[in-house]
Amino acid sequence: SAVDLLAATGVRGLRLKKEAGIERVYVNDASSTAFALMKQNAKLNKLKLFISNLRAHEFLAVRHKAKDKKFGYVDIDPFGTPVPFLDAGVKAIVENRGGIIAVTATDTSALCGTYPDACLRKYGAKPLYTYLMNEAGLRILIKKVQEVAAQYDIALTPLFAHTTRHYMRCFLQAARGADKADKILQQIGCFQGAGPMWLGKLWDEPLVEKMFRLTF
């Protein structure tokens, strides 16, 4: 199953259902306008989605009471920083079967060093304001998500990550275990006056090669 916690029009959920063939897809948004659009778009595409009109935390709180309360894929794509949604988000992943969490950040002015104090407050790291700022910001974002997950003995390994125009996005695969989480944290450090940030690989090479072959 998959959930898009801040789904807006629901297009990502529709694609997960139609293109990826995921059986149970949940789309949620606190906006009543978005809720109406999600229902309309699902109807136009003749697809069954589980559509809700709740705040992200409320949705996860309700789901926590359900038998199948966790998801194989959790998508967090807010306007601005994803930090307020990370704690509930990582706890919603099916961590013992390789669940994936996708996180987007659009507050690139903080992550890329224009507002370093904001980056320090939100992400607990000092950014770079140089030609390396995009990669450094992406690594700071990944670090933040990993730290939140590690509190619950969940290790998050990057599958794919990128920066594009006004946003940064990362896909991280979960594994249960304190030892595994510790190994992830050991790959977090500082770099020439910036950090702490994720110092490991930004993507899984075999996966990216396969993506490239399928695309081109």
Predicted stretch roles:
Residues 1-216:
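SAM-dependent transferase fold signal centered on methyltransferase-like domains
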